[in-house]
């Protein structure tokens, strides 16, 4: 599995991901963040967003999603990046239903843990 240092990222993208990990893990200590998509594969275009999966032990509800959105929005503005967020409960993500999702297959194949 690749590390963040090995990826073809612009410096502002690298810093944004580092700050995202720090802030999300401060607020949700059990969080796991996985980069996937074109940035993880190394074939991103100029307009590509940064796709991230955030796994959390808590139940996913509107309030939690709003908290994550506030964190990501501030970082997006600061570093001039755009995140594509998927937030899931860790137990659900391990379930057979989640494992049957094409998104899950892609993240398993190309995902990079931050």
Show the residue positions of the predicted features.
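Catalytic core of pol beta-like nucleotidyltransferases
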Residues: 1-32, 41-46, 57-114
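Glycine-rich beta-strand-to-loop/alpha-helix junction loops that act as flexible
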Residues: 36-38
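Short, aliphatic-rich beta-strand segments
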Residues: 49-55
